[in-house]
Design a protein with these regions (language model features):
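Membrane-embedded alpha-helical bundles of multi-pass transporters/translocases
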Residues: 3-495
Length: 495
């Protein structure tokens, strides 16, 4: 078969079966449920359950961002340097880390009785660093989508639904924690402490531990099942090269820089994400009611991703990403205005309107969650065409250099903005005597500003670099066909 016919066949043939597709998405969904459980609740656990002072919370966020980043530098070189065996390159890694990752997730919401002060701080930092390391290895489950099929349209379809599964899975812990909170109360917590001799510090702490345990069990089963059935079908060289050269190739790629700058700017929205649990507590009187904020946003996200998936048939990804940034700024500003009126008047109709606007805010996540993975997959092919190597782990790491800087700034500054002496927001921490303290109007409004307008500004700025991004349409297809030709020649040499 000629190279031309082989390339045409690869662009037309369907490789991924329905069973493989469904089980893979289930694995991704529950893997992201595990990461979402920690990402969405750990800050609230530190502040409301362990009662860390703001200085320790900021230091914790700084250390648990920087230390895993340094370790990840070596981990991604190991992953990209692995030879593709019979089981593939990424599948075995995802299967190996599923169980230890689940265990560390549970430990992220449990502190041994008697620990306090410096010893407690060292413990939670150690667990968080381990969690970060396992997440880097576990992210191999997402890399599998890039190599499941050489068919460009089928690859984009897999990436689209993988992103949808990730987004919905990331929101699932909110519902899980809520349901657990409805079942377990203060009496249950005291009973468990008495029977087991443990020291779970609050009902909220019990919610997190039980929720983490549920996520871990289901996560292990689905990740192992999904990774057992999927196949990696992309052919690429197994030649060993200096991994540092790969980083240089990525940095030299002009298309890569668009994504690097965009993700750098977008990660400042971590300040907004940090505020989510606390605005729920401030506005609704109970942090467990966070679902009233998160659920409309989550539904909007799922709908938004389906809408983006449909619009990709008529518009290119670049246009949709830029438009999404503009929409995000407008929707968040409108939500702030409605929220402000609600806080100052207490009108129940405005409360309903505000919830609707939370749904509208969620729509913009459709683009921000779905399209970056496609951009990265396209850029990886331009690098593969030049070098013959794939850098599925190294490229996200290079992107993370920028997000490390902006994310570290965001996670370090956010607690200082939120509470403590001299904070801008003035959030009052709960205590044993006052578990749900009343927050002032100024606190609620300022929290809302950082939760909405701050987020909209950063999403708008994240779209600006894509005004200069040209790897779309015909250019994207030409690169893909050239890569398929290169892979076919490589396969013939290896045969």
């Amino acid at each position: 078969m000629s190279n031309t016919n082989a390339i045409q066949t690869q662009n037309e043939q369907k490789y991924v079966g329905k069973g493989e597709f469904v089980l893979y998405l289930m694995g991704v969904f529950f893997y992201t449920t595990m990461t979402g459980m920690v990402g969405g609740n750990r800050n609230a656990y530190l502040v409301n359950v362990l009662r860390l002072p703001e200085e320790q919370t900021s230091l914790f966020n700084l250390l648990t961002t920087v230390i895993p980043f340094v370790l990840n530098f070596f981990i991604v070189m190991y992953i990209d340097g692995r030879r593709m065996g019979k089981g593939g390159k990424f599948r075995p890694i995802a299967m190996l880390v599923a169980v230890p990752m689940a265990i560390v997730m549970i430990l992220s919401f449990w502190a041994p009785p008697g620990l306090s002060g410096t010893i407690l701080f060292i413990y939670i930092v150690t667990i968080a660093v381990l969690w970060g390391v396992f997440c880097t290895f576990g992210n191999s489950i997402n890399m599998v989508a890039n190599v499941m099929t050489p068919n460009l349209k089928e690859r984009d379809r897999v990436l689209s639904f993988r992103s949808i599964s990730s987004a919905v899975g990331n929101s699932a812990p909110v519902a899980i924690v809520l349901v657990v909170g409805l079942i377990w109360n203060k009496d249950n917590t005291e009973l468990i402490n008495a029977v087991t001799g443990t020291s779970i510090r609050s009902v909220e702490g019990l919610q997190y531990i039980i929720s983490a345990a549920l996520c871990s069990v289901v996560g292990i089963i689905t990740v192992l099942s999904g990774m057992k059935i999927v196949r990696e079908r992309t052919v690429y060289t197994a030649e060993k090269k200096n991994p540092l050269v790969g980083f240089v190739d990525i940095i030299k790629n002009k298309y890569a820089w668009t994504i690097i700058i965009s993700e750098f700017l977008k990660s400042f929205r971590g300040i907004s994400t940090f505020m989510e649990a606390f605005i729920a507590a401030a506005v609704l009187g109970d942090i467990s009611k966070k679902i009233l904020f998160v659920l409309p946003v989550g539904i909007g996200t799922a709908v938004g991703m389906l809408v983006i998936n449909f619009l990709l048939k008529k518009f290119d990804a670049r246009q949709l990403y830029i438009a999404s940034g503009i929409y995000s700024l407008c929707a968040n500003c409108a939500a702030f205005g409605i929220g402000y009126l609600y806080f100052t008047t207490g009108n129940s109709i405005l409360q309903i309107v505000f919830i609707v606007f939370l749904f509208l805010i969620g729509l913009q996540f459709g683009a921000s969650n779905l399209l970056p993975s496609m951009f990265q997959a396209d850029v990886l092919e331009t690098i593969e065409l030049k070098t013959g190597k794939r850098f599925d782990a190294s490229f996200p790491f290079v992107i993370s250099v920028g997000t490390l800087i902006s994310g570290t700034i965001a996670s370090t500054v956010a607690p200082l903005l939120l509470y403590g002496d001299g904070s801008i927001i003035g959030y009052i921490q709960p205590t044993d005597l006052v578990p749900n303290p009343v927050q002032s109007l100024g606190t609620k409004v300022t929290l809302l500003f950082f939760y909405t307008i701050m987020h909209g500004i950063m999403m708008f700025l994240a779209g600006v670099p894509f005004f200069f991004y040209k790897l779309t349409g015909k250019t994207k297809e030409e690169y893909h066909e050239a890569v398929l030709k290169q892979r076919e020649e490589m396969a013939q040499k290896q045969a």
